[in-house]
Amino acid sequence: MFEKALASIREAIYAILAPASLPPGAATPSGGTAFMIAPGLLVTAARCVPGGSGPGNRPCPGLSLVRAPDIGRGTEPATLVTLDRGKGLALLRIEAPRSGASLRLLDAPVPIGTPCAYSGFPRLAMDPAPLPGASLIEMFQGASVSSFARTQGPGGKPVSRYTTDAPLVGDASGCPGFTASGEVFGMLDCPPGDLRSAAPSWVPSMDIVSFALDNGVPLPART
């Protein structure tokens, strides 16, 4: 069901490479996933930006990314455009991207029960150092949308979230969730703590669209 969609999704997903200095010959761990929503502009989870999850921390302004089809061909530098801890979102920019492939964001909720999937690069712990042999691991997981709810977030602001019914595959924050058509319905934002008992939580695509437009990102027109 998702074979064609996954092929197009992979063209626009990126691994965020951990910024820690690694010894020569060491494996390259992932710091999470980002995906392109307009040429040169990407969205990820705030927690995937080093220093982005803690309110007292200063986010790292520069990152190194590698697009899924380009693994083994070199990385691309990216800069942080803006970060909103309340929404759990961050925007990144690649000034001269090798590829302009971007994903289409849905502008309305999907029905409960919609078959979906997600793909990307689970985050690996960097404190104090990568696990021996840990490296970039690209994963795919199928699921169904199980709920859509609006709750009160930080500062009393309303927050919308989807949940899905399949267990989490590690901390896959930043992964795009997509339907069989290849359209993105949300971005996975894993809660801190024990992921084995956590329900997958998704920032809805509508919130990503609003976040992007509020920050001057010209999203491609829908056809």
What do these predicted regions represent?
Residues 2, 18-39, 45, 75-76, ...:
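A conserved glycine-rich beta-strand in the N-terminal activation segment of trypsin-fold
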Residues 5-6, 34, 105-109:
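Short, surface-exposed secondary-structure edge patches
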Residues 6, 37, 178-223:
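C-terminal subregion of chymotrypsin/trypsin-like serine protease catalytic domains
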Residues 6-23, 118:
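A short, Trp-centered hydrophobic/proline-enriched beta-strand micro-motif
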Residues 16, 34, 40, 44, ...:
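Terminal peptide-recognition signature
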Residues 28-31, 169-173:
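Short, small/polar residue-rich loop motifs at catalytic or cofactor-binding pockets
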Residues 31, 38-85:
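Catalytic-histidine neighborhood of serine endopeptidases
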Residues 101-162, 167-172, 189-200:
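Flexible, gly/ser-rich surface segments that form the specificity/activation loops bordering the active-site cleft
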